[in-house]
């Protein structure tokens, strides 16, 4: 879905780092290097970025209103 704004454990703001993280990965950086360049040193914040699954594009393909038109 949408990247959380803050780390669930420590509360550090991480939501603004997602786009930069994706850009760094496209520049052939490893995940660890990208997280280091972003300044994410705590393992809880690193976990938030590493385990995030961006599903918003897939969910936009499903429109619940299109099924209701047939009623």
Swiss-Prot record:
Keywords: DNA-directed RNA polymerase, Metal-binding, Nucleus, Transcription, Zinc. Disulfide bonds: none annotated. One of its GO terms (cellular component) is RNA polymerase III complex. GO terms for biological process: transcription by RNA polymerase I; transcription by RNA polymerase II; transcription by RNA polymerase III; transcription elongation by RNA polymerase I; transcription initiation at RNA polymerase II promoter; tRNA transcription by RNA polymerase III. Its main location: nucleus. One of its GO terms (molecular function) is zinc ion binding. The keyword Membrane does not apply. The keyword Transcription applies. It is found in: Nucleus. SUPFAM superfamilies: RNA polymerase subunit RPB10. PROSITE patterns: RNA_POL_N_8KD. Pfam families: RNA_pol_N. Zn(2+) binds at residues 7, 10, 44-45. Signal peptide: none annotated. Component of the RNA polymerase I (Pol I), RNA polymerase II (Pol II) and RNA polymerase III (Pol III) complexes consisting of 14, 12 and 17 subunits, respectively. NCBIfam families: PRK04016.1. DNA-dependent RNA polymerase catalyzes the transcription of DNA into RNA using the four ribonucleoside triphosphates as substrates. Common component of RNA polymerases I, II and III which synthesize ribosomal RNA precursors, mRNA precursors and many functional non-coding RNAs, and a small RNAs, such as 5S rRNA and tRNAs, respectively. Pol II is the central component of the basal RNA polymerase II transcription machinery. Pols are composed of mobile elements that move relative to each other. In Pol II, RBP10 is part of the core element with the central large cleft. Belongs to the archaeal Rpo10/eukaryotic RPB10 RNA polymerase subunit family. This is DNA-directed RNA polymerases I, II, and III subunit RPABC5. It comes from Schizosaccharomyces pombe (strain 972 / ATCC 24843) (Fission yeast).
């Amino acid at each position: 879905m949408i990247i959380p704004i803050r780390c669930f454990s420590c509360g550090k703001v991480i939501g603004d780092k997602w786009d930069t993280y994706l850009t760094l990965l496209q520049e052939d950086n490893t995940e660890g290097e990208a997280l280091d360049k972003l300044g994410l040193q705590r393992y809880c914040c690193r976990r938030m970025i590493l385990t995030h699954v961006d599903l918003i594009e897939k969910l936009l393909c499903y429109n619940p209103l299109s099924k209701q038109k047939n009623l």
